[in-house]
Amino acid sequence: MPRRREVPKREILPDPKYHNIELAKFVNVLMTRGKKSVAEQIIYGALNHLEKKTGKDPVEVFTQALSNIRPVVEVKSRRVGGANYQVPVEVRSIRRSALAMRWLRDAARKRSEKSMDLRLASELLEASENRGAAIKKREEVHRMAESNKAFSHFRF
């Protein structure tokens, strides 16, 4: 571990339209090459599509989708006596959100719809209903942790 002082967490301001901090974080996750306005347009477009499709509050659908994607446990490699073991560990809350946002972004990028806002909207809708590629990724991580439960005594 570094011996320098601990780096403070930067405060992220809520997004300008919906005043939601998680949306602002997701804008930063989606942003490429510093083009924040493009990322905001994609997200707001996706939320508009969601509102038209479902008739529900789009921010509510977004938070429901994220909470469905968040992993509880994951595996970490631990070397013991010349062998590598996949040790299941609980995921900290900040990392849970970060992983969920990354998985959501990657799943939306892999979809076949025409524009990114349509891809993101349909992935958000599926994730809020507990299906889709991002949910599949979470289930895969949970399955890995479950199958390696025998090595959970190798704590970090």
Curated annotation (Swiss-Prot):
Keyword Ribosomal protein carried by entry: yes
GO cellular component: small ribosomal subunit
GO molecular function: rRNA binding; structural constituent of ribosome; tRNA binding
Gene Ontology terms: biological process: translation
InterPro entries listed in its UniProt record: Ribosomal_uS7, Ribosomal_uS7_bac/org-type, Ribosomal_uS7_CS, Ribosomal_uS7_dom, Ribosomal_uS7_dom_sf
Keyword presence, tRNA-binding: yes
Family statement drawn from the similarity comment of this UniProt entry: Belongs to the universal ribosomal protein uS7 family.
Matching NCBIfam families: rpsG_bact
Annotated function: One of the primary rRNA binding proteins, it binds directly to 16S rRNA where it nucleates assembly of the head domain of the 30S subunit. Is located at the subunit interface close to the decoding center, probably blocks exit of the E-site tRNA.
Known partners and oligomeric status: Part of the 30S ribosomal subunit. Contacts proteins S9 and S11.
PANTHER family referenced in this protein's UniProt entry, alphabetically: RIBOSOMAL PROTEIN S7 (PTHR11205)
HAMAP family: Ribosomal_uS7_B
Name of this protein: Small ribosomal subunit protein uS7
Source species: Nitrosomonas europaea (strain ATCC 19718 / CIP 103999 / KCTC 2705 / NBRC 14298)
